[in-house]
Amino acid sequence: QSQLHEILWKQFSVRKYLWAEFIWCMFDFASYGRVEGDTKSQNDKGLCTRERIPKDVYFFYKSVWSSEKTVYITERRHEFRACDVPFVKVYSNADAVELCINDVSHGRISRCELPDDESTVFVWKNIKIKPGTKNKICTKAYFSDGTSRTDYAFWTGK
């Protein structure tokens, strides 16, 4: 879901004549007869679940539209992963974000290195995690006022 919204955002950002963007719905909701995903009779296009738990896409829009300091590791609920992780993606409106796996830095990406239409999507590629153990995925976001925020996830390598 968040990947679709990232693609749409790129389209919106180059069309300066658009004066507004709208989200279809904030929350997933009941929809009799609908069969999609793993839940029947539910429209699952909301930014949050029916239980009001924010999905990744919620944090994408928060990083784009809000001035509130945001840093969020995506796909965090996918806890069990192959040891070769194709990418780690973080949504943040910070000036720079650093990724650490088990307290080892995998580099800091500056916002000025990102394309304008992806200025809140930070991606590290070809990351390896240890098999059979919980790996601590940590990001630290650095903001222009000198403050920082961190986010954590734990992924177990298969």
Feature locations, PLM:
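A short, sequence-level motif marking secondary-structure junctions
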Residues: C112-L114, W155-K158
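Edge beta-strands of extracellular beta-sandwich domains
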Residues: D145-G157
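Extended substrate-binding grooves/exosites of carbohydrate-active enzymes
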Residues: Q1-K136, K140-G146
